A protein has these predicted regions:
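Generic structural signal for well-ordered, non-membrane alpha-helical segments
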Residues: 18-19, 26, 66-70, 125, ...
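Short acidic/polar active-site loop segments enriched in Thr and Asp
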Residues: 83-84, 187, 206
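His/Asp/Glu-rich mid-to-C-terminal helical/loop segments that flank catalytic regions of hydrolases
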Residues: 217-252
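Active-site rim beta-loop-alpha module in soluble metabolic enzymes
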Residues: 126-185
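Non-catalytic positions within long, well-ordered alpha-helices that form the structural scaffold/packing
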Residues: 78-79, 182, 201
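Zn-dependent metallopeptidase/amidohydrolase metal-coordination segment
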Residues: 194-227
């Protein structure tokens, strides 16, 4: 089934699929591959390349921003026999001491009650494969990356749902979500991971994330664009290394 990932068919994806929000990042990450092929080329926000990494078939696909388009992309990847999916993206840090350029691995995701309620009730946990997450953590720390592990929040909106104040209506009070969630153990916020974790559990495949911190919401310091691009490529390479080690360990 490939209604939106036009041209994708079973057998295309290989052993590991990375997903990113930005279609432009597909080209960046696929620069790590050899024998690169374009399977989906700018179908809405979806771009999908496949290639080889260390002699193994891998792929990278963009999902666009947010829950709706991400659910479409992940579902169609899963329906076309994705064996492992890892989100390589960005996030905002909500805890002091987590700095722009650091990396966050989420061991679970809080979410709004409406998020994917068509699939599961709100009490159903959104969690990664713990062994895959641990493998990624080991690879990152072995390569001297600053890594934080903890529970994140997947928001359905960028502005109100993350405590930002658009000039919508001054009579609408903007909730201070960081003040609410940070004492409850939430270390970061983004817009896609819970979808991946829920669908990974339902389809019974290993999933995880690896998020570059692009902004600290405690002091509004940002990673500059050049460093952000470099960090995404570096972290994606380490994620691929970890993913293939995970495959080797868990298929013997």
């Amino acid at each position: 089934m490939s209604i939106h990932l036009k041209g994708l068919k079973p057998g295309d994806l290989g052993e590991v699929t990375l997903i990113v929000g930005d279609p432009g990042r597909v080209e960046l990450i696929s620069s790590l591959f050899t024998n690169v092929e374009s399977v989906v080329d700018t179908s809405r926000e979806f771009v999908l390349y496949v290639g080889e990494y260390q002699g193994r078939r891998v792929s990278v696909c963009s999902t666009g921003i947010g829950v709706g388009s991400t659910e479409i992309a992940i579902t169609e990847l899963l329906e076309n026999d994705a064996q492992m999916i890892i989100r390589c993206g960005g996030c905002g840090a909500w805890r002091e001491g987590i700095n722009p350029g650091d990396i966050i691995l989420n061991s679970g995701m809080a979410r709004s009650e409406g998020l994917l309620s068509a699939y599961v009730p709100a009490v159903y946990p959104a969690v990664p494969n713990p062994l895959l997450l641990s493998q990624i953590h080991n690879e990152l720390t072995s390569n001297h990356k600053t890594v934080h592990v903890g529970i994140g929040l997947t928001s359905e909106t960028y502005y109100f749902g993350q405590g930002r104040t658009p000039a919508l209506n001054t009579r609408i009070e903007t909730p201070n979500l960081i003040e609410y969630w940070e004492p409850r153990g939430i270390i970061n916020c983004e817009m896609e991971t819970a979808v991946l974790y829920l669908l990974g559990s339902l389809y019974n495949i290993p999933v995880a994330n690896c998020l570059v911190v692009h902004v600290s919401r405690t002091n509004e310091k940002w990673t500059n664009d050049e460093d952000y691009r470099r960090l995404h490529r570096e972290s994606a390479e380490l994620v691929l290394n970890a993913a293939l080690k995970f495959v080797n360990t868990n298929t013997q």
